[in-house]
UniProtKB/Swiss-Prot annotation:
The beta-hairpin motif is involved in DNA binding. The lineage of its organism: Bacteria, Pseudomonadati, Pseudomonadota, Gammaproteobacteria, Pseudomonadales. SUPFAM superfamilies: C-terminal UvrC-binding domain of UvrB, P-loop containing nucleoside triphosphate hydrolases. Forms a heterotetramer with UvrA during the search for lesions. Interacts with UvrC in an incision complex. HAMAP family: UvrB. Belongs to the UvrB family. This is UvrABC system protein B. One of its GO terms (biological process) is SOS response. ATP binds at residues 38-45. GO terms for cellular component: cytoplasm; excinuclease repair complex. The keyword ATP-binding applies. InterPro entries: Helicase/UvrB_N (IPR006935), Helicase_ATP-bd (IPR014001), Helicase_C-like (IPR001650), P-loop_NTPase (IPR027417), UVR_dom (IPR001943), UVR_dom_sf (IPR036876), UvrB (IPR004807), UvrB_inter (IPR041471). It is found in: Cytoplasm.
Length: 671
């Protein structure tokens, strides 16, 4: 059996050794809940990685959003390169659920755009849980939504061993049952091609390898893994297991049973609607449901088949849906990152989904059984959650009530202490902020400013820009990828000040930021609560000169508690440093790191690392260019590379080349 192998050049330091020891002790003692109260920059992920390596248990890591999940995936991947670190998030790039608005008699059809790469990673995650003990799955709240049951899923898998008696046509039929499609021209994921007695199959969960099965008469003569691009054989295999293309694939006999159950419910519902004089609703329901049944009978699936999941999984009415938790082994571990955000998210999902579906059922768009296609309720989630570690700098009330043990990780391995917090009058906040920004820009440090409203952020950005400050702002209209680009540009020094509202909190890792300014800090509410203030102040904790300024006319209870907690942590950190002769060291982190985590992870990560390295080399080379002829020659070379990268569909690398060319053209004009 594979074991977790932690690969790192660091040893636990600061509060980490004690935190790791206590967490391991708690897990082995059977504690159902523990809380790791770890400040920003204290290495919480590293501590959790050490715990996983010591207890040797498969782990589910729950993050509050895709960006943080991707960062954690990247970190765990680097800590456990020889183990199965997987990524399970929603595979929708865009999702519009079906809905009905009675007031305007408007029905909105379900519309979605599925990210093929993330779908592959989800399949890879469940495969890892079913086949391996050394699995770490990084997920979001997506894990509480319905998934095909593992029992049904496993019934559909296809095992092929070398030496098996296997008819070619039978193999092709089984692949079709798994929803694989034959395509001899375009060999892509979840397809197969047949060339005589050689069958090439591209597994649905694979991103790197395809499988070649060679038959001699009706016997499997050879199984090999090969590169689907070059055709090069990577290795010979004694056996291989093919998993279905979708988690919702169902055996034929189960489908037939489900159809009978749906027909019975349809008749009961039609009778109810007609008896209540809802003839339009009855006609609509009958037409839609019979069309779906015909599709299921002929093709094995239909659009919106998840609405019949109760029958497909054989569950009684009202039972919890099968989810990713059903794939977890009994000895699994659950780690909830930024638990003060993640736990309330889990509780919020059920009610919103229920409200929308009840309207669809009432007006004849869906059968009542569609209500069972839902996320888990909070009490159901609590019932299936394994031993849990909450991880947060500001644990919430739920963690306080449930944690059997609270473990503090306040002292950072780098010796860095929490930023000094200062309260200044709100009356002159903008002018005072401008003078503070000028000081920081002079020493090439960055500044974060958080405001209360979008309008305020825009006005402040305009004001600072008018005074010569290189500034940008973040708001809810900016998508995740662009948000990451903005943070990257701030770190690179493309601009010096970033203004935001509620986006400058969890998960922003920016060692270059030395000042956090919180405007109108005395306006009590969600954005100025104790937890929000502590999280925002923590953004300056990775810099040696970190400082936070709260602009307020009075000190609120939230401010007092946030400042008090920051001072308590700061005193403990300074005392530890003095007792152990530690001199604080600033954090220097590669700017490419944030992009590694925040873009969709996968097999192309090596290419991205190479891309970042190439960009660095380009930058060094560009600095050495002097004459206009040298610059012009370099522009031509880069343009050729850019067009080649675009032809190879390497658009991220091509975009970097484009930016380099733009900089060189500016230099050419200045020469």
């Amino acid at each position: 059996m594979s074991e977790f192998q932690l690969v790192t050049r660091f040893d636990p330091a600061g509060d980490q050794p004690e935190a790791i020891r206590l967490m391991v002790e708690g897990i082995e003692a059977g504690l159902s809940h523990q809380t790791l109260l770890g400040v920003t920059g204290s290495g919480k992920t590293f501590s959790i990685a050490n715990v996983i390596a010591q207890v040797q248990r498969p782990t589910l890591v729950l993050a509050p959003n895709k960006t943080l999940a991707a960062q954690l995936y990247g970190e765990f991947k680097s800590f456990f390169p020889n183990n199965a670190v997987e990524y399970f998030v929603s595979y929708y790039d865009y999702y519009q659920p079906e809905a009905y608005v009675p007031s305007s008699d408007t029905f909105i059809e379900k519309d979605a755009s599925i990210n093929d790469h993330i779908e592959q990673m989800r399949l890879s995650a469940t495969k890892a849980l079913l086949e391996r003990k050394d699995a770490i799955i990084v997920t979001t709240v997506s894990c509480i939504y319905g998934l095909g049951s593992p029992e049904t899923y496993l019934k559909m898998v296809l095992h092929v061993d070398r030496g098996d008696k296997l008819d070619q046509r039978a193999l092709v039929r089984r692949l079709a049952d798994l929803q694989y499609t034959r395509n001899d021209m375009d060999f892509a994921r979840a397809t197969f091609r047949v060339r005589g007695d050689v069958i090439d199959i591209y597994p649905a969960e694979s991103d790197l390898e395809a499988i070649r099965i060679e038959l001699f008469d009706d016997e499997v003569e050879s199984i090999s893994a090969f590169d689907p691009l070059t055709g090069e054989v990577i290795r010979k295999l004694p056996r291989f297991t093919f998993y279905p293309k979708s988690h919702y694939v169902t055996p034929r006999e189960t489908l037939l049973d489900a159809i009978e159950g749906i027909k019975v419910e349809l008749q009961e519902r039609l009778e109810y609607l007609r008896n209540n004089n809802k003839l339009v609703e009855a006609q609509r329901l009958e037409q839609r449901t019979r069309f779906d049944l015909e599709m299921i009978l002929e093709l094995g699936y239909c659009n919106g088949i998840e609405n019949y999941s109760r029958y497909l999984s054989g569950r009684p009415a009202g039972a919890a849906p099968p989810t990713l938790y059903d794939y977890l082994p009994a000895d699994a571990l659950l780690v909830i990152d930024e638990s003060h955000v993640s736990v309330p998210q889990v509780g919020a999902m059920y009610k919103g989904d229920r409200s929308r579906k009840e309207t669809l059922v009432e007006y004849g768009f869906r059968l009542p059984s569609a209500l069972d296609n839902r996320p888990m309720r909070f009490d159901e989630w609590e019932g299936v959650s394994p031993q849990t570690i909450f991880v947060s700098a500001t644990p919430g009330n739920y963690e306080a009530e449930h944690a059997g043990r609270v473990i503090e990780q306040v002292v950072r391995p780098t010796g860095l202490v929490d930023p000094q917090v200062e309260v200044r009058p709100a009356l002159t906040q903008v002018d005072d902020l401008l003078s503070e920004i000028t000081k920081r820009v002079a020493v090439e440090e960055r500044v974060l400013v958080t405001t209360l409203t979008k309008r305020m952020a825009e006005d402040l950005t305009d004001y600072l820009a008018d005074h010569g400050v290189r500034v940008r702002y973040l708001h809810s209209d900016i998508d995740t990828v662009e948000r990451v680009e903005i943070i990257r540009d701030l770190r690179l020094g493309t601009f010096d000040v970033l203004v935001g509202i509620n986006l400058l909190r969890e998960g922003l890792d920016m060692p270059e930021v030395s000042l956090v300014a919180i405007l109108d800090a005395d306006k009590e509410g969600f954005l100025r609560s104790e937890r929000s203030l502590i999280q925002t102040i923590g953004r300056a904790a990775r810099n040696l000169n970190g400082r936070a300024i709260l602009y307020a006319d009075r000190i609120t209870g939230s401010m007092e508690r946030a400042i008090g907690e920051t001072e308590r942590r700061r005193d403990k950190q300074i005392a530890f440093n003095l007792a152990n002769g530690i001199t604080p060291k600033g954090v220097f982190k590669d700017v490419a790191d944030i992009m590694e985590g925040a873009t969709v992870p996968g097999s192309r990560s090596k290419k991205r690392k190479g891309m970042a390295k190439a960009a660095e080399e380009n930058a060094k080379y560009e600095a050495e260019l002097r004459s206009p002829s040298e610059i012009t020659k370099r522009i031509r070379q880069l343009e050729e590379k850019m067009y080649q990268l675009a032809r190879d569909l390497e658009f991220e690398a091509a975009a970097q080349m484009r930016d380099e060319i733009a900089k060189l053209r500016e230099r050419l004009l200045a020469v």
